[in-house]
Amino acid sequence: RMGNPPPRIAETPSGILNAVGLQNPGVDHFIEQDLPWLKEQETVVIANIAGNTPEEYAQMAEKLSESSVDMIEMNISCPNVKHGGVQFGTSCQSVGAITREVRAHCKKPLMVKLSPNVSDIAEIARAAESEGADALSLINTLTGMRIDINTRRPIIRNNTGGLSGPAVFPVAVRMVWQTAGAVKIPVVGMGGISTWRDAVEMMLAGASAIQVGTALFSDPYAPLKIKEGLNRYLDDQGIASVTELAGMVKPW
């Protein structure tokens, strides 16, 4: 996948806007060139896939199922070119259909990455769960836009992009809480996590694990610092395992 033409990243207050276009060398290159090195690091490898047709998703899932990856994460915030470019992740029907298609070709645990650009995240989550998802991850980016006031053109060549970083964190916490209360499968929380306090908050909302992305632009060691802070918090609180945090929020 070639990705989008530049400019494709713009800084925003408390975050970034990007329209990179999921540029990558492809699943075959990943399996042959990148995966062997990743497995040498003695870490769990989760392969993220994205496509423009159900067939593309299924083909990638099938190939990765025969590889040594530990899990497949399916990004459904992509346009379905067979249905007018509408994103796969914006309706229960399309989420259920793409999950069912990939599940039929996937031998690995399957995690579905949900879009926040929906009216009811809980019903979307249930649709993915009902069609065989083993876990859910959320949130993906919120759609946003910036305009150069001198040229009067959008700053990003794609016109719009995905907003990530601390600006979306409260939205992510809310959606993780709603999703965790609607499904029985594990929920992985993401969206603006940059400190260990954010990680604790996300897990209290219902996340069993977290992902860190945008914070790495400013601090490549952010995940290590988050882990260290999280361990200190557990010790201070007398909590034996991080799993005990998941969903422990006390709503009013």
Q: Where is each model-derived feature located?
A:
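Glycine-rich, positively charged N-terminal anion/phosphate-binding segment
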Residues: 1-43
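C-terminal helical cap(s) of enzyme catalytic domains, especially alpha/beta-barrels
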Residues: 3-13, 147-161, 203, 215-240
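Predominant activation on well-ordered alpha-helical scaffold segments within soluble catalytic domains
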Residues: 28-35, 96, 100, 173-180, ...
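Generic secondary-structure signature for well-ordered alpha-helical cores
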Residues: 39-40, 66, 104-107, 134, ...
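Alpha/beta enzyme core
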Residues: 52-188, 194-212
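Short Gly/Pro-enriched loop/turn and capping motifs at secondary-structure junctions
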Residues: 193-195, 217-218
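A short, charged, Gly/Pro-tolerant segment at domain boundaries
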Residues: 243-252
